[in-house]
């Protein structure tokens, strides 16, 4: 992996067919990709208890923007699939791109003497499960109502295909961000919520939610400028996570940008 000190975060454009690239500071990319959230104690999702087979073929092979071959379940393998088209900013190798002219100022604004802290791991941290979990569901997954308590005006309305036992970041008793991430593999849709609580009637309550189109560069067609999302920055969470199925391939297995905070 290369560390580019003047790399980027992305913010969604409204009604557009592209992403606006905002140079905001230091980010990490692999030669062809990478992915994780670096804010403690929110590292990437741990490996499944019974890992599915990693995607076939050599690292570098893969299917972009079509997740129909993904396995089902919590922490399931995508079997070589990647969210969004190959031309998407999340999947673009920027290792040969010129450094932004404002690189030094951006780095100084973040903190020149501050490093990056990787939060990889599995198991428990202070009694709570480590990582940001996700679950892959089929297109037949029942859709349920989601009540948004804080950012309804900036959320994509339900229903969402959320299983009642969908994994919650930090576990059911967590007092943290409580993200829920669900991938509908058959419809190529990503559903993300924050401060998520299952309700007795099968519905969910969350502070806000976003639906991303994994088969398009118009990743969130409903979004307006400055809208938030489950990560509070207008970005999807899932595309930047490091997953077991890709990391297990070794060098070259991660082919997307890394997420960190």
Specify the residue positions occupied by each region the protein language model found.
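Intrinsically disordered, low-complexity regions enriched for glutamine and histidine
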Residues: 13-16, 37, 162
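Gram-negative bacterial Sec-dependent N-terminal signal peptides
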Residues: 9, 16-29
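Short, surface-exposed polybasic-aromatic patches that bind anionic ligands, especially phosphate groups
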Residues: 48-261
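N-terminal secretory signal peptides that target proteins for export/translocation
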Residues: 1-15
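Intrinsically disordered, low-complexity regions enriched in Ser/Pro/Gly/Gln/His and often acidic
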Residues: 2-3, 24, 83
């Amino acid at each position: 992996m290369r560390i580019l000190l003047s790399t980027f975060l992305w913010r969604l454009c409204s009604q557009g067919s592209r992403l606006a690239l905002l140079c905001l500071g230091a980010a990490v990319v692999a030669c062809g990709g990478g992915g994780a959230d670096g804010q403690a104690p929110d590292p990437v999702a741990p490996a499944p208890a019974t890992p599915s087979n990693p995607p076939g073929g050599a690292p570098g092979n893969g299917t972009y923007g079509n997740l129909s071959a993904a396995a089902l379940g919590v922490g399931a393998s995508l079997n070589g699939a990647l969210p969004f088209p190959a031309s998407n900013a999340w999947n673009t190798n920027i290792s040969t791109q010129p450094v932004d002219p404002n690189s030094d100022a951006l780095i100084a604004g973040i903190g020149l003497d501050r490093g990056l802290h990787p939060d990889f791991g599995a198991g428990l941290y202070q009694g709570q499960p480590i990582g940001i979990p996700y679950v892959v569901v089929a297109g037949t997954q029942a859709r349920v109502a989601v009540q948004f308590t804080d950012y309804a005006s900036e959320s994509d309305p339900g229903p969402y295909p959320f299983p009642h036992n969908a994994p919650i970041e930090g576990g059911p008793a967590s007092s943290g961000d409580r993200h829920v991430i669900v991938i509908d593999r058959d419809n190529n849709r990503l559903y993300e919520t924050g401060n998520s609580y299952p309700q007795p009637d099968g519905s969910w309550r969350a502070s806000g939610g976003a639906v991303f189109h994994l088969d398009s560069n118009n990743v969130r067609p409903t979004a307006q400028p400055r809208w938030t999302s489950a990560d509070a920055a207008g970005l999807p969470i899932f595309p930047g996570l490091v997953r077991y199925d890709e990391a297990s391939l070794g060098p070259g297995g991660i082919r997307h940008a890394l997420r960190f905070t």
